[in-house]
Amino acid sequence: MTHAFTHINADGNAHMVDVTDKSVTEREARAEAYIEMASETLEMIMSGSHHKGDVFATARIAGIQAAKKTSDLIPLCHPLMLTKVEVELEAQPEHNRVWIRSLCKLSGKTGVEMEALTAASTAALTIYDMCKAVQKDMVISQVRLTEKRGGKSGHFKV
């Protein structure tokens, strides 16, 4: 790997990358996360019997909100005008987990990878928050970028 860190300047200090001269292109990123839990906890979510309400709806909205607030959370991220944010949650009872997938899109000068990752991880954290009274040992895992399109570095897919 010969690439340099783009967020470190010649003096070794962190800085926000200057995207002034970059071209506006269509950009898209997808990310995923999993949250593992006891079968009883997952059943409570799936049946809608959780005392805090609809866990999936709340996690979906939290993920969307988080994508829009990424630059407030991660210091060197640019504020972006996202044109689409999607968060999908799928119960996987055979694995005692929820699979979370996110999609972020825009036409702009910088990518949306961090927004997609923030959406997926925040949705997982929201599920944890809503279910922690029932189960404290849930595990959030495999938060990762699964696909990226647009920009100079081109297409990436796991």
From Swiss-Prot:
Pathway: Cofactor biosynthesis; molybdopterin biosynthesis. Its EC number is 4.6.1.17. Substrate binds at residues 76-78, 114-115. The keyword Magnesium does not apply. InterPro entries: MoaC, MoaC_bact/euk, MoaC_sf, MoCo_biosynth_MoaA/MoaC, Mopterin_CF_biosynth-C_dom. Pfam families: MoaC (PF01967). GO terms for molecular function: cyclic pyranopterin monophosphate synthase activity; GTP 3',8'-cyclase activity. Coiled coil: none annotated. Keywords: Lyase, Molybdenum cofactor biosynthesis. It catalyses: (8S)-3',8-cyclo-7,8-dihydroguanosine 5'-triphosphate = cyclic pyranopterin phosphate + diphosphate. One of its GO terms (biological process) is Mo-molybdopterin cofactor biosynthetic process. The active site is at 129. PANTHER family: MOLYBDENUM COFACTOR BIOSYNTHESIS PROTEIN 1 (PTHR22960:SF0), MOLYBDOPTERIN COFACTOR SYNTHESIS PROTEIN A (PTHR22960). Catalyzes the conversion of (8S)-3',8-cyclo-7,8-dihydroguanosine 5'-triphosphate to cyclic pyranopterin monophosphate (cPMP). Belongs to the MoaC family. Homohexamer; trimer of dimers. This is Cyclic pyranopterin monophosphate synthase. It comes from Shewanella halifaxensis (strain HAW-EB4). The gene is moaC.
